[in-house]
Amino acid sequence: RFNHLYGETLVVPEAIIEDQVAVIPGLDGQKMSKSYNNVIPLFAPEKQLRKAIMKIETDSKTVEEVKDPESCNVFQLFQCFADQSAQQDLAEQYRAGGMGYGTAKQICFEAIRDELKDASEHYHQIRGDHAHLEGILEGGKDKARKVARDVVDRVRNKVGL
């Protein structure tokens, strides 16, 4: 509305969301959300992460039965962390039958653990170094203050203040 009245002044941000990971499934297959109490703690200790992955809800098909990867919560989560080749391999195993959901969950856990290993280590390092964390926050505050000051100045100029 401001831009309509005063000309292009404020930039409306655009979301950058990949279609295949627009919604990350939680433990119950719904979108992952604290509100739904179905969050997978990605930076939790390995044992806790594995325990959460093993709780993902699946259907009651037996090990021998052919499974549909596209309708499986485990596979949907796996797609967020595995490369195309690994996704194709797991999809073929689903369609061939002979693989249980426990095996699929273990494969999913390993993919998540491996993909997030460096990020998890960095997260825990930062969380443990309060002085470094304060420095990051201060830097962010200064950067945000400068950007905000520039925006406020542009707005004031447009409205004549």
Enumerate the language-model features and the residues they cover.
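Conserved nucleotide- and phosphate/pyrophosphate-binding catalytic cores
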Residues: 1-161
